[in-house]
Amino acid sequence: MQGPNVAAMGATGGTQLSFADLAHAQGAAWTPADEMSLRETTFVVVDLETTGGRTTGNDATPPDAITEIGAVKVCGGAVLGEFATLVNPQHSIPPQIVRLTGITTAMVGNAPTIDAVLPMFFEFAGDSVLVAHNAGFDIGFLRAAARRCDITWPQPQVLCTMRLARRVLSRDEAPSVRLAALARLFAVASNPTHRALDDARATVDVLHALIERVGNQGVHTYAELRSYLPNVTQAQRCKRVLAETLPHRPGVYLFRGPSGEVLYVGTAADLRRRVSQYFNGTDRRKRMTEMVMLASSIDHVECAHPLEAGVRELRMLSTHAPPYNRRSKFPYRWWWVALTDEAFPRLSVIRAPRHDRVVGPFRSRSKAAETAALLARCTGLRTCTTRLTRSARHGPACPELEVSACPAARDVTAAQYAEAVLRAAALIGGLDNAALAAAVQQVTELAERRRYESAARLRDHLATAIEALWHGQRLRALAALPELIAAKPDGPREGGYQLAVIRHGQLAAAGRAPRGVPPMPVVDAIRRGAQAILPTPAPLGGALVEEIALIARWLAEPGVRIVGVSNDAAGLASPVRSAGPWAAWAATARSAQLAGEQLSRGWQSDLPTEPHPSREQLFGRTGVDCRTGPPQPLLPGRQPFSTAG
């Protein structure tokens, strides 16, 4: 079922069931429905609207909740009944969800809560086959709600129309299998509207159209339909034996080709279970099917915990660059903004700096160039590229003001220009963030002067710069520590602790203290066997960007505690005047930018004349969203503080 589009915005904390986890969807035990023809099978097509895409939360963020349930019971093409109700999520609905679904917090204020609605829905569904479009989303939310309400999950049969569509339709016929796209393809009578009952009705029509297609291929019972879904070739089934020797442990797996070459590298919390999915049709990616056909063996490395598995995967991807992996194969393809080594330094965008006075990393060169131009304006560094000797003076060779103003002072010596260099170095190193405060103030002033377009562009550039500065400062603080030992509880089921020895931002050793075993002797043992790490002059001491970022995220997870640091270190700390105080401002600015982009992609015609409530807080005041008056002139791309804005 089509879930709210916020799942694409986010949230790395989002969780939904894989198709292998759906209750009895594939490979389930025999039920009476298996022997029934599809015409005799009763389906309950369900759709949910929610406050977001996460079924689980943490100490800081609660899980998202269901706001509406809509369902249609059908059999033999006839509608037997419908179920529809709003659900009180017991917290406010985010503005982007309100804009998407039209369901407001006020609308659900008097609605029943999920603990009252769920038993009624299960009674309505009975022992029918549950159908959903993107079933992992909808069934995942229903199961999570049942668990939180202490309601027994009825273990229904589950059918996903999105997966069925991808199995039945070619990509030429259906490039997208989103519900709206399939509704257009089949010209269904009920159009999806991001309201639960409307979407459920549309899914009923899509289901019937897909069943018509499979009927021509000899699929007439629900059991035959389940067997039809996996789309597994006999050659794939024959290779299941490759996974039989793998342990049920976390680790890294490597698919190898006929000549021993590494085809693909991946990680798993359970090696045997994850690798088996490549042979039962759970993984639907075309390139994975091709890779499995080429594979002749599978190697694996057991790991103490998921952090070690993630780090080992990144290192193996860097070493082998497997052809069937798409990410992390080229760990040095990052862009950095660095101070040049010359008499009149400037900010330059380069791939491989030889020192650590850098801003970044950036995936995009254009973002790095925008940040370099903005920081030059903030600190008074020059943007002209003329090579100046120590005895020269800056200014005569700069372009005229009307063309492209150089932010550095004119007619100054190298000694006088050094003040700007010190300001830039202090900003990069986290010793002085006054320039960021001034830039934020300029955004406010532009908004107060009703120059909203200029303010929005400056806001977006500044948000990118703050995020890059703060990200780099945190990673450099971790890379500067000679040694840090951290522990994370292994969860209530396993017990014990996951242990990591981190040296200069790199994982030097990993281990686990099982439940009932004193952890400190284990810490001492893995510390003695830890790898020696020698930092280099490169950014982050030579650590892989993705590795140190992965470790930093792990350290920030709930429950992680620092066991100890090296004797000569004060601990893991950010610079006193880092970009951190402005990180929340940058996050708000980024949300405003995303909201503006969504509006520009088709919501302008629906805008009310007054400011939209979801955009009133762009700059902390109502009315800043005013769209009256002549358009503002565009800011030059490399001069965010120029006379245009």
From Swiss-Prot:
Exonuclease domain: residues covered: 44-207
Organism: Mycobacterium tuberculosis (strain ATCC 25618 / H37Rv)
PROSITE patterns recorded: GIY_YIG
Keywords, alphabetical: Endonuclease, Exonuclease, Hydrolase, Multifunctional enzyme, Nuclease
GO-annotated molecular function: DNA binding; DNA-directed DNA polymerase activity; endonuclease activity; exonuclease activity
Alphabetical list of SMART domains matching this protein: EXOIII (SM00479), GIYc (SM00465)
Pfam families in the record: RNase_T (PF00929)
Superkingdom in the source lineage: Bacteria
Alphabetical GO biological process terms: DNA damage response; DNA replication; nucleotide-excision repair
InterPro entries, A to Z: DnaQ (IPR006054), Exonuclease_RNaseT/DNA_pol3 (IPR013520), GIY-YIG_endonuc (IPR000305), GIY-YIG_endonuc_sf (IPR035901), GIY-YIG_UvrC_Cho (IPR047296), RNaseH-like_sf (IPR012337), RNaseH_sf (IPR036397), UvrABC_protein_C (IPR050066)
GO annotations of cellular component type: cytosol; excinuclease repair complex; peptidoglycan-based cell wall; plasma membrane
Gene3D superfamilies assigned: GIY-YIG endonuclease (3.40.1440.10), Ribonuclease H-like superfamily/Ribonuclease H (3.30.420.10)
Region Disordered, residue ranges: 603-645
Protein name: Putative bifunctional exonuclease/endonuclease protein Rv2191
Presence of the UniProt keyword Hydrolase in the record: yes
Bias type Low complexity, positions: 635-645
Domain notes: Seems to contain an N-terminal exonuclease domain and a C-terminal UvrC-like endonuclease domain.
